[in-house]
Amino acid sequence: MSAIQRWLDRFCYKHPRFGIPNLMLVIVVGNVLVWLMDQFSYGVSLSALLAFSPYYILHGQIWRIITFVFVPLDSNLFFLAVSLYFYYMIGSVLEREWGTAKFNVFYGLGVLLNVVVGFLLYAVTAPLYPSHLLPLLTTASMTYVNLSLFFAFATLYPNMQVLLFFIIPIKIKWLAWIDAALFGWSVLSSLFGVFTSGLAALPGVIIPLVAILNYFIFFWDNFLQLFGRVKYQTSRQTVNFKKATKQAQQQKG
């Protein structure tokens, strides 16, 4: 276990009441309220007032550092409802598995990392835009936080089945592998862009990896165990092959 993971476990053990109980319920209710306000407000978008805009944050609207977590990722009611239900479900399961403190640390760390990424992205991209467009730049959302939440759930419950398109039963691990492949392809495409287009494409490599760093911190031991198990199984098979070859030679002799 890494030093960071040991520290996290000790912190959560000593502070079991740290954080907000039923955090995902708070997030879901907040998203629903903001969506409703957007639908019934005329000329004023609450989402625009809460979104992560570094320009406005640096000009005093510091609430945006937190309130962007309540900005809906979809304006379509059906897709928003499905998304919120899904993330409420997996978030609630993770909170029961880990406890309130550890789940809040995981989620809060994801939000913090995306705030850092948002400011980094703004620092890189702001010089490319005229000054009158800077207020329109929103450089962080809950996309990567939700992705890290999904990866965490799939790691702990890989064989749980869900209905894809409400029809096709599929294990959660296969959906996670698909998301991981798309995520990896996006990073590799940006990495290729560094060699073809220059350093302007570098944020596309660094930012996604930093944004889901909370997942890697919490599940680093799982990666080590996975690679260790594969290495062990490969080594064991090699030894068995040598023994089988030697036995076959002895039988021929």
Q: Where on the chain are the PLM-derived regions?
A:
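Cytosolic, positively charged, low-complexity intrinsically disordered regions immediately flanking transmembrane
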Residues: M1-K14, F195-G253
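N-terminal TM1-TM2 helical hairpin plus the immediately adjacent luminal interfacial "cap"
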Residues: P16-V116, Y122-A126, P130-H132, S197-P203
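Juxtamembrane/interfacial segments flanking transmembrane helices
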Residues: V44-S45, Y157-I170, F219-K231
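Hydrophobic core segments of alpha-helical transmembrane domains in multi-pass membrane proteins
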Residues: A81-Y85, T143-F151, I167, P203-D221
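Alpha-helical transmembrane segments and their helix-entry boundary regions
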Residues: F103-Y107, F165, L175
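Small-residue-rich segments of transmembrane alpha-helices in multi-pass membrane proteins
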Residues: V111-V115, K171-F183
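Hydrophobic alpha-helical transmembrane segments in multi-pass integral membrane proteins
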Residues: F119-A123, I178-F195
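Membrane-interface micro-motifs in multi-pass membrane enzymes
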Residues: V124, L128, H132-Q161, P169-W174
